[in-house]
Structures are given as structure tokens and as C-alpha cells.
Amino acid sequence: MEKPLLPAKLVKKEADPLVFSTIIFLFRFLPITLALYYLAPAKLKNTVLFLCSLVFYCWGEVRFFPVMVALILINYLSGLAIEHFDAKPALRRFFLLVALIGSLGMLFYFKYANFVLRSVNALLGTAFAEIQGIGTLPLGISFYTFQTLSYSIDVYRRDVKAERNIINFGAYVVMFPQLIAGPIVKYRDVSDQLHVYKHRYNLKQIEEGMTLFTFGLAKKVLLADAVGALWTDIIGVADSPSTTFVGLANASTPLVWLGIIAYSLQLYFDFSGYSLMGIGMGKMLGFDFPANFNYPYISASITEFWRRWHMTLSGWFREYVYIPLGGNRKGLKRQIFNLFVVELLTGIWHGANWNFICWGLYYFVLLALEKLFLLPYLKKGRVWPHIYTLFLVVVGWAMFVGNDAGVEFGLLFQKLFLPSGGVMPLYFLRNYGVLLAVSVLCCT
């Protein structure tokens, strides 16, 4: 949500962040952090986790340190105030509003402000100057702002008690395993574990965590990076080390389809790989994070796809947007409207560009059609619902990657749907065919 850390659309490019798959993280940061954490007295484990996570957060951009501190303080103090004024609804609403404005305000300023200014200038012919100094995003801001939002809302709903220890709360917000790619962890998911100081973890948990981390790393390095090279070879980018890239304008329609399929595989292995590494590291530290992916490419409908893809994000929007708006309890028209709001916000969450908004609305249309009449027919089929779903998902990823480096949105869709000549895929099938086959097997 957002090729560096993740495929470029999920996390806006950072200034050399400390990525899970880098040598310095694998052989320096992670071993040192785990050693300090395991050796620390029980009462100091959260302090060690908090401080090490701050180092991780500040590694690439220390100038964003005040942003994290401010976000922690705003939500920590607001949570205490909401609980303190339990018998005064107006004050409770006021402090909830403070927390929401603080979290959403920071997210909007860093991620969307310049996009809004550019869009207004383009639509109205104005000449508002863009804000300087926010060309890169604070690391993981799309993820940890949603965590602070859920915390403040849950305290307001009385679903959880406000955290009184600021170190514990800070450790929850900035916990490095889930900071850059999720899963999005609600406070109630880890609140009990944050307050278990002795016997938080055991050797079996550490072993399970190491296994999950290794599988996630393999997904990222052996599959995502390798199959992503096919997409890069096809589109070509200015700083690509490859000397064999074709360029989108020179690619034939079959080659572009091969490339977008490769991108779809890369996106899944990259994102799910990072999430799995995060879940694994959480287990090593004694925390059980929720699963984030469940073989989404085996889905037989778009509805099922969104139950399997980025499950913590879908669950977040369902709990904090869809259900409060009325969910499916207020009639079909209201349900479709609620779906529209959720999918629009999902697109906006993934990035500050119009292609993300189009991508979100694209899925709204598909989900609405399934709600209205398609689902009963899809449930009757065996093979064709899977083909239908995969085709539409791949087309969606083409929309998602539109306007990325080396990709022109209009040209990409022209190549996909208006048959054209150019470089054919035979050379790339010879070089990547086995890898593609293995990748398909590993995601089904």
C-alpha cells in the first residue's frame, strides 16, 4: 500500500530505509536487536523494542523522528483523556477528534497534500506552489497511522483500556517488524502480550518465527526480485542495470501481457513476503500478528479475492468504515454506497495518484456487480470463475502500475487491448519460463 521496499505503488520511495532483505538488516540490525531483547530484563523488553524500533524508523530519514514522536504523544494523551472523561461524552468526542485529526492530518500532509495541489492546478488552471521538503514519505506512515487510528477509536468505543505506559504504547506504534509492510496490527491484537513481561516467548515460538521469516525472505529474494526482473526487462527504466530491456512502446501485445502477469506475481510475492517476514519477527519477539494473505490468486470471485488479499487492510476498512456506515444492514442501495466509500478509500490509501483512485473505483464496480447478480452464477462454476477472477485482477494490476517509472497508463492499456506488433515473448519465455511456472505453483 506505499522496485525498492515494495513494488513502487504500495509505499512511496524512501531515502535508503533499512529493508528486511538487506545485508545490514539481516546480519547486523536483526541479530543485535534480538540479542539485546532476549538479554534484557523482563521489565525492560518493551523499552529495548521501542528504542530499537526507533533506530529502524530513523535509519533512512532521521528528520522524521519528530513526526513519530508527535503521533505517539497525540494518540497516547488523547487515549488517556478519552478514558478519563468517561462520563462526559462531549469531551470524549473532542479528544477522539484530536487524535483523528492528528493522525489523518499527518498522513494527508506528507502523502496527499502535493497531489491535491497538483490536481487543483490541473483542473482549475491555478498555480499553487507545491510544499517543499515532503518528496519522501516518513517510513511506514500509511501503516502506523491506521494503527493509531484504530487504537483511539477502540478506546473511545470502550473496546480496550487506554495504555498508561507510554513506552508500551510507543513500542506498539513503532514496532519494526510490521512497520514497513504490515500486517496492520490493532492494539487489542497485542495488548495482552505487551503486558506479559515474563515468558512472553519460548523456543518453539522463536523456531516458528524463524521459519516464517525464512519463507518470507525466500518469497522476496528468490521469487519477487527474480520475476520482477522480467517486468523491468520489458518496460525498461532509466536507472535499470539491464541492457536487454525492450521498452513498452516496442513490446508486442503478447509480451505486454506476459509482463503484466510477471508484475502481478512480483507484487504478490513482494508484499506477502515482507508481511510474512514481519509476522515471523513478531513471533521471535513473542507477538502473534494476524495473517495478511491467504493465497489470493486461487480466488473464484473478486469478493473472495478481497477476503484473501491484504486481509488486515480489508478488515480495518470493514470494521472502522463499512460497518459504522451501516454495512449491509440498511438495504441494498446503502450497502452499495458503503462499498463505494470503502473501495475509494482503499485506492486512495495505496497512493497519491489518479490511477489509484481509478483502481479503487474499478474494484467497486466489480464488487457491486457481484453483489447485485454475479455471485450466484460464480458459485455454480468450477473453472471459469477462477479465470474470470484472475483476468480482472491482472487488469487491475495494470491500472495499479500505470504511471510508474517506464509505464505510460494509456500506452499500457492500448498495448493490452489493441493487438499490436513488436518484440515477441519467445526470448523471455526461454529465459523466464521455468521461473514463471514455479511462481505460479507457489502462489496457488
Where in this protein do the model-derived segments appear?
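Membrane-embedded transmembrane alpha-helical bundles that form the catalytic cores
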Residues: 2-443
